[in-house]
Amino acid sequence: MEPAAEILVDSPDVVYSPETIEARYEYRTTRVSREGGVLRVQPRATRFTFRTARQVPRLGVMLVGWGGNNGSTLTAAVLANRLRLTWPTRTGRKEANYYGSLTQAGTVNLGLDENGREVFVPFSALLPMVAPNDLVFDGWDISSLNLAEAMRRAQVLDCGLQEQLWPHMESLRPRPSVYIPEFIAANQTARADNLIPGTRAQQLEQIRKDIRDFRSSAGLDKVIVLWTANTERFCEVVPGRNDTAENLLHTIQLGLEVSPSTLFAVASILEDCAFLNGSPQNTLVPGALELASQRHVFVGGDDFKSGQTKVKSVLVDFLIGSGLKTMSIVSYNHLGNNDGQNLSAPLQFRSKEVTKSSVVDDMVHSNHVLYAPGERPDHCVVIKYVPYVGDSKRALDEYTSELMLGGTNTLVLHNTCEDSLLAAPIMLDLVLLTELCQRVSFCTDSDPEPQGFHTVLSLLSFLFKAPLVPPGSPVVNALFRQRSCIENIFRACVGLPPQNHMLLEHKMERPGPGIKPGEVVATSPLPCKKEPTPATNGCTGDANGHPQAPTPKLSTA
């Protein structure tokens, strides 16, 4: 991958220093009030000052479930890219890349060049970001297999790549992890040979020691902890037990019910490490969220949005956005990896069902023309375990929508999702974006005291099926709204306006700034153009707005 050109915003509102990028930014919104039968809309503007630290830290990543399919695949991906590996396959030679990563393979539009052409740059070029090849990995797993053996067990990567990675991954071994049998399926017992002993309080302290040991031994500036282990059953929120930070810490000391993932979350927060939950269970109970707020530590979740659900968050947005009333969504999955085996247990499946079913809620609520209050589509989710297909998950969806005048439209989609190869770049983005957000602060003219983002990092919603948001905030699931949020906030950090896709420069009769008078600019090679077809309605222009002779009147004789 070629390095991106340096971006320098030439504006009096943007100041570059060796330490920071400081940008003045006007945030424009509207406030709507109801007065009788009138909706009164008032434009508003707030002046922000964003400061982004330019110094990129040495970053460590600790994965809970490091020896699983996702953990071993992400580790292999970073090593393969760092070593610039290539390997033969039956369809030709392949080389390591970061396809599927928003930050590494996505682009953003900077604007128009002197010829009126759009200029795109890698997402990672907008702001100083940790290079993925520089990440340092460690983690925990209830299975004692080293990462090379875990990679072979996962059966995700080509043999030619596994052989080259083997000597680099063989020395990587997960630390013992927490195993509480009642939280995951009974079929996971056979893997559980690498466990932290003791009480819940002792296990919590051991996790904290592991984080401190990794930080010091690897010479790290920061550590981020990410849960990519088994889906757990939901944990009941009980007043007096896990509803406040104090109660949750007391519950751990007493050895009462706390899920393994919540133990890891609490340990991470106490060590001032951001914690990200890649599974669907309610790891971040109210007490954990309060603890994160008290210590100003980022948390994010829940459940990686990688395959079927990512497609759903695009497709339903398209259907409802097109004015079609989607009334039935039926989603069927079968997969054969360890995630599928764990989800074959009813309580663990229920956790997944909840996150996969809520993904269309905001799109339905956005259109009261189509949906009456309380009305929503029928939504059914089925997951089955089929060992033979391994990590190659099959997803089948049927969407049925109502059309005008009583018609119906049914769309059926088959999607083969390479589960871990889709999840690994999402994990990468979560870590890189979270770290970058830790270096951003801002203030407003009315509140000049610098602050950071809310500790519930909802900016990461693009990457989660059931995104956590601060109390009272709207939950957004529509994929392109989520992506625009990330892009436009980062544009604000360098003083650029939000991407609005208007392209008014190309829609004016007399071209505006950036377009030479009379010049027609094509953004891509065009095929040979047919001669203009005379209009049948008396219009005197072709489809491109070029004048043409009036349509001759046909003789009626």
Swiss-Prot record:
* Catalysed reactions listed for this entry: D-glucose 6-phosphate = 1D-myo-inositol 3-phosphate
According to UniProt, this protein's pathway is: Polyol metabolism; myo-inositol biosynthesis; myo-inositol from D-glucose 6-phosphate: step 1/2
Q: Which residues bind NAD(+)?
A: 67-70, 141, 177-178, 188, 191, 228-231, 278-279, 303, 306, 337-339, 352, 390-391, 419-420
Q: Where in the cell is it found?
A: Cytoplasm
- Carrying Phosphoserine, the residues are S279, S357, S524
Pfam families from the UniProt entry: Inos-1-P_synth, NAD_binding_5
Does the keyword field hold DNA repair? Answer: no
Q: In which tissues is it expressed?
A: In testis, it is expressed in Sertoli cells. Highly expressed in 2 types of germ cells, pachytene spermatocytes and round spermatids.
The EC number of this protein is 5.5.1.4
Q: Which InterPro entries match?
A: Myo-inos-1-P_Synthase, Myo-inos-1-P_Synthase_GAPDH, NAD(P)-bd_dom_sf
Q: Name one GO molecular function term.
A: inositol-3-phosphate synthase activity
Keywords from UniProt, A to Z, are: Cytoplasm, Inositol biosynthesis, Isomerase, Lipid biosynthesis, Lipid metabolism, NAD, Phospholipid biosynthesis, Phospholipid metabolism, Phosphoprotein
Give the UniProt record's GO annotations in the biological process aspect: inositol biosynthetic process; phospholipid biosynthetic process
Q: Which family does it belong to?
A: Belongs to the myo-inositol 1-phosphate synthase family.
Known role: Key enzyme in myo-inositol biosynthesis pathway that catalyzes the conversion of glucose 6-phosphate to 1-myo-inositol 1-phosphate in a NAD-dependent manner. Rate-limiting enzyme in the synthesis of all inositol-containing compounds.
Q: What is this protein called?
A: Inositol-3-phosphate synthase 1
